[in-house]
Amino acid sequence: ELGPRMGELYPVVAGLAAGERVVVHGAFAIDADLQIRGGASMMSAAADADASASAAGDGARIELRGPAREQLAAVLQAYLAMQVALADDEWKQAQAAGSRLRDAAKAVKLEGQAAETWKPMAAVFERRGDEAAQSKAIEGARGAFLALSIESKALLQIFGNPLEVPVRLAFCPMANADAGAEWIQADETVDNSYFGAAMLRCGEIRATVEPGQYLLGSAR
């Protein structure tokens, strides 16, 4: 956290421990190193976030019924399968869930404004789902999961919870290279998909979304 400007400088008043440094020029190099080690680009994940941020940020809500709601339920169920697999450190299962998620997103057929809103979201689900399916290590699947979590959050904000069970918005401050990251899960207890068994309970539950209800707040 930065304090008031002092000439050409901004003092850091919180969020930085003694001896730690702030990266101001090497972000691209750090991001490239992450990709080389099997993770998804943090910058491309941020770009994905713009896909539906406008609609969700404006508080847009679209109610779906019947087959349309069932199709989005299949998308969220596949995402949740990946969430559980990564929390359990089960890479192969995460790959399978990624393939299932990609196919579920492709199968969604909406009309009118719902279709226009869903189109950029579907592109992210399909691309990142395939990225997880084709990942060479669990780190790659977790990188894809970061972008998928952003989009799943937006899905809950725009279309509501299409499932017959509650889902939760969870947050870990140490995920995403200590920048923090959210994800969606069904369990009431934190199951950290970014770290698995190493830090399974690291994080907090921020919100619960009941069936048919919408996640409140801005998209990103």
What is the predicted role of each segment?
Residues E1-R220:
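Intrinsically disordered, low-complexity terminal tails/loops enriched in metal-binding residues
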